[in-house]
Amino acid sequence: MDGRVQLMKALLAGPLRPAARRWRNPIPFPETFDGDTDRLPEFIVQTSSYMFVDENTFSNDALKVTFLITRLTGPALQWVIPYIRKESPLLNDYRGFLAEMKRVFGWEEDEDF
C-alpha cells in the first residue's frame, strides 16, 4: 500500500495542480473508475469533458493521462501501476492510453469514439 500511495503522491506533486484562480470548471468532477467495462464509456466522456473545458490545465497528453490515473480505483488502479513503475511511453500518449484501457477492460467500440 505504501508504494501505491507514494506513486500517487509523486503524480500529484507535478504540474497538474492549477494555480489558485477564480474560474471554476463548470463540468462536474468525474467519478472514479474501478475497471467495470460497462462504466468505461461514461468515465471517458466525463473525464474528456472535464479536461476539454480547461485546456490550460490539461495542456498536454501527460497531464491528461495523469488526471485519468487519479480517477482510477481498485482493479483499474492496480492495472496502471506497472505502467507507472516502468515509466511507459503510454503515460505521455492520451489516445494510446485510452486505447489500452479500452483493450484491457474489454470495451469494443466504433472507431469514431
Swiss-Prot record:
More details: RTL8A is one of at least 11 genes called Mar or Mart related to long terminal repeat retrotransposons. They do not correspond to functional retrotransposons, but rather to neofunctionalized retrotransposons genes.
UniProt-listed InterPro entries: DUF4939
A Pfam match: DUF4939
Coiled coil region boundaries: none
Family per record: Belongs to the FAM127 family.
Name of the encoding gene: RTL8A
UniProt protein name: Retrotransposon Gag-like protein 8A
Domain of life assignment: Eukaryota
